[in-house]
Amino acid sequence: MKSLLSILMTTVVLSPIAVAQGPGHSPARDLETTDMGAQQLNTIGVSVDRDLQFTDERGYPFTLQQLFPGKQPVVLMLGYYSCPAMCGQVLEAAFYALGRTDLQPGTDYRILRVSIDPNETPEIAANRKAAFLVKLLKTNGEDSWRVLVGDAENTSALAEQVGFQYYWSEATKQFAHPPSLIFLTPEGKVSRVIVNSYFEPDDVRLALVEASQGTLGDFWDKVKLNCLTFDPRTNSYSLAVMTLMRIG
């Protein structure tokens, strides 16, 4: 049993979690939006409303019933397409991490980007998708990820369900909101939330494996999830010492 403990310790300690730093990495985080993001950590297990109505980038009606229940986990990103500040940096960091998970959008997971600005149009969403997102991540088919707009009622309802707090600042003429990735199970339940302006590829991979409920991941992913716990203070998976001691 001691040898098993040694193997697990070696595997976890040598894991590249919290080592690779992608674009947009910055230790300094906005305190206000970080505090806003803390609310998201209380929504684990909450189901999103499948009847919420949006419009996709092609101008077609879209409800969350078109995603849930499904066969793959979903990465939900809330923000807005015309954001002049943080959103672009966060998206770049997210796609950098997703692109290094060895998991494929469309095949292994799906991506959902929803605007919190009720004034944004499908045309804005389509232009943003074409100009920015496609350059950052290869996708397997048009439906592997969707970009949506919606009215204030539906977007605010979705945001509230996943604990995503935001407000319009008259001072800056921008929406203030936390930078985050929200991982949903194939049934549409919040499985994990990472609140940060950068994302480690191994953390993102483990969050996807965790959200998949057993359909994704290899043996070592499962070992890591048994030996690591998600630490909301660091927004990262870290060594669960008590678990290892029990194994030993």
Model-predicted regions and their roles:
Residues L91-T155:
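Structural microenvironment flanking redox-active thiols in thiol-disulfide oxidoreductases
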Residues L64-A94, I111-L112:
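Short active-site neighborhood of thiol/selenol oxidoreductases, capturing the structured segment around
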Residues D56-E57, L184-T185, D231-P232:
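Short, acidic, Ser/Thr-enriched surface-loop or helix-capping motifs
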Residues S47-D49, P69-P73, G106-I111, E142, ...:
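Extracytoplasmic
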Residues D231-G248:
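Juxtamembrane/start-of-transmembrane alpha-helix segments at the extracytoplasmic/lumenal side
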Residues K2-T55:
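N-terminal targeting signals for export/organelle localization
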Residues W168-L225:
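Extracytoplasmic/lumenal ectodomains and periplasmic regions of secretory and membrane proteins
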